[in-house]
């Protein structure tokens, strides 16, 4: 049977990106990714070519750009999830009273200008998530017992969202870090429980977002993507043939593997579609990366800027940021001399000097969060501003890092189409499930989701009536 090539000759901007990426490659019929109805934008002049024959196609749904077909009405909705994996001093973060008339705590007072733009949560945690310092890997997955033997993670909420809307943007998601231990710690995990490495360099994020690359570099990348697709196709065929000879348990393992293969295949296809589409014009120059890991606050500010630019240019709608204090030395904080590593300070044992230093670190983080809220709010969009269309979740896997407790997690939610200006106080002994927040966030993004991980519903008091 002759192999066929699909010749894309469209001149629309999405079609052009796919055209140039696909012209040199053979589209194999067994590959899931390039299925015409789901994965390609076809020109009305598209032909099937093979063995000297060119056959025109009838008018197909796929001749409408997939990015136009799938585009949700109105302004895009986004999410930014931030985790500081060494927590905050609880008595200085949580308000003493609840409701709309709560009194701002010392830390929340740093955000007083934006009181009506955020909600603070108390008495929340992930059911079954313990594991001490390992618990940060479950911050967005909610997978229980991360410190236990044989633990296997599950999909993080950002990747769950990206699977639904990631095709609408150049990057389905961005996984960022500040001093994150690459390959060991991340907030983002695939549906097969595989860690997605953090990008710690703001300059690298900037390059991905805005620098196009030369024609030769683009061609080289396209060839790599084509080779990757071919490999994925071969792997899929081989695994199908192998299945018939395996036990039930091995078939389950192989199914997990092929799921990862299909996900990689899908990402390859989307990458080809975007490879030649022009990148947006950068609103600012390339950032300069700090040379020392003690510039924790400077790196945090830069990553907040990169997240804002990614949303502002609609390069992605899902961003995670892990601030890894475990991997940070004595960090710089203006006005305070920090004499010990961040992790050691978090185990303060009520030492007055350590508490003073830790308080300065926590307050500086709140100030930076305030800057982020301000900057998002200052970007006007068709329906309000960038903050109104972006849910920002800031929190920690630790309720109290000094005691390694993973209950009573400090969580603040800003922006988006949620009810704000309140303190939602739940039972600090019998905690309310934090996964319910994730369901509410997704529903506020117009995603038809009723369940995620160990959720029991939506979060009480957060969604507008």
PLM regions with names:
Residues 2-465:
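Ligand-binding pockets and gating/stacking loops
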């Amino acid at each position: 049977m002759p192999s066929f090539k699909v010749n894309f000759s469209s001149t629309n901007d999405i079609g052009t990106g796919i055209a140039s990426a696909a012209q040199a490659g053979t589209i194999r019929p067994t590959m899931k990714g390039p299925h015409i109805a789901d994965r390609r934008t076809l020109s009305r002049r598209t032909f099937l070519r093979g063995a000297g024959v060119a056959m025109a196609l009838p008018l197909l749904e796929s001749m409408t750009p997939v990015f136009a077909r799938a585009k949700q009405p109105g302004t895009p909705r986004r999410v930014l999830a931030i985790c500081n994996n060494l927590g905050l001093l609880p008595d200085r973060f949580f308000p003493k009273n609840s409701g709309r008339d709560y009194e701002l705590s010392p830390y929340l007072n740093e955000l007083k200008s934006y009181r009506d733009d955020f909600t603070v949560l108390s008495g929340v945690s992930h059911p079954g998530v313990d594991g001490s310092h390992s618990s940060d890997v479950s911050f967005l997955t909610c997978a229980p017992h991360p410190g236990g033997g044989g633990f296997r993670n599950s999909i993080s909420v950002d990747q769950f969202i990206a699977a639904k809307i990631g095709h609408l943007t150049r990057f389905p998601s961005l996984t960022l870090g500040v001093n994150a231990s690459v390959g060991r710690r991340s907030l983002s995990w695939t549906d097969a429980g595989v860690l997605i490495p953090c990008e710690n360099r703001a300059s690298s994020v900037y390059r991905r977002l805005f620098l196009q690359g030369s024609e030769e570099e683009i061609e080289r990348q396209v060839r790599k993507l084509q080779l990757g697709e071919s490999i994925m196709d071969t792997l899929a065929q081989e695994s199908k043939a192998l299945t018939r000879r395996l036990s039930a348990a091995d078939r389950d393992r192989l199914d997990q593997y092929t799921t990862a293969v299909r996900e990689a295949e899908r990402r390859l296809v989307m990458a080809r579609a975007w490879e030649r589409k022009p990148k947006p014009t950068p609103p600012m120059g390339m950032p300069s990366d700090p040379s020392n890991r003690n510039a924790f606050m400077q790196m945090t500010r830069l990553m907040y800027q990169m997240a804002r630019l990614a949303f502002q240019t609609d390069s992605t709608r899902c961003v995670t940021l892990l601030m890894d204090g475990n991997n940070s030395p004595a960090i710089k904080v203006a006005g305070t001399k920090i004499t010990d590593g961040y992790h050691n300070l978090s185990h303060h044992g009520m030492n007055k000097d350590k508490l003073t230093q830790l308080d300065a670190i926590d307050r500086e983080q709140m100030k930076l969060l305030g800057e982020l809220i301000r900057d998002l709010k200052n970007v006007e969009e068709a329906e309000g501003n960038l903050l109104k269309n972006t849910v920002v979740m800031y929190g920690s896997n630790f309720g109290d890092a000094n005691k390694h407790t993973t209950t009573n997690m400090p969580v603040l939610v800003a922006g988006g189409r949620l009810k704000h200006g309140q303190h939602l106080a739940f039972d600090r002994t019998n905690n309310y499930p934090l996964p319910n927040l994730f369901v509410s966030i997704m529903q506020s993004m117009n995603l038809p989701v009723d369940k995620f991980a160990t959720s029991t519903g939506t979060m009480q008091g957060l969604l507008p009536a």
